[in-house]
Amino acid sequence: MITALWLVSALSALVYGGLWVLGPVSPLRTVIKMVPVAALALIAYLTGPRHGLALLLPAALALSAVGDGFLAGDPKRWLPLGLASFLVAHLIYVALFWSASAPSAISEPIRGALIVAAILGGLGMLTWLWAHLGAMRGAVSAYVAAIVAMLATGLLLPWAAWPVMVGALAFMASDAILSADLFVGAKIAGSERLSGYAIWALYYGGQAAITLGLMGLDL
């Protein structure tokens, strides 16, 4: 069952990335986009103890899948709801990562340096976007704070959970590329296709890595 769900998740991610990432808005495209991370949520639920902190992972993944559905639609209509879904998902990740953090992690210089780099990266991105955000300034500022907190708390996990750290970084990179595209119109090498592929690959890869990494911890 779990192996089948991993296959469903990975194959639907490949199908969406290969055929629909730049496709027109449609109900089918929305469903296909939601399936990969929804399958990860089901995997996390079925393989976890189904109580306490372990339920935070499937909850964050399920909210992310809902966010995927909103962002598959018309951004002018659904972007605020998509941002809200992912904002709550990030806050759940923050709570989960913090609760599972290594006791001495905060005192390790390398982690401190990485966290400072994450904060500076978030501030730099927000500064660059600021003039283009208009009425979305408050919402985007809250979102950037949440995803930086998600990456920072992920960096406090035991080193054995390194896939979570890589996944959180990939997630933030995906959001940075998406934000540059949505608000500034900036694309990788001027290519909408390259940007679309990068956004999806980093996002799905990040979520899969977070799922794998947390499944290896005793939550």
What are these regions (language model features)?
Residues 1-219:
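Polytopic alpha-helical membrane-helix bundles and their juxtamembrane interface segments
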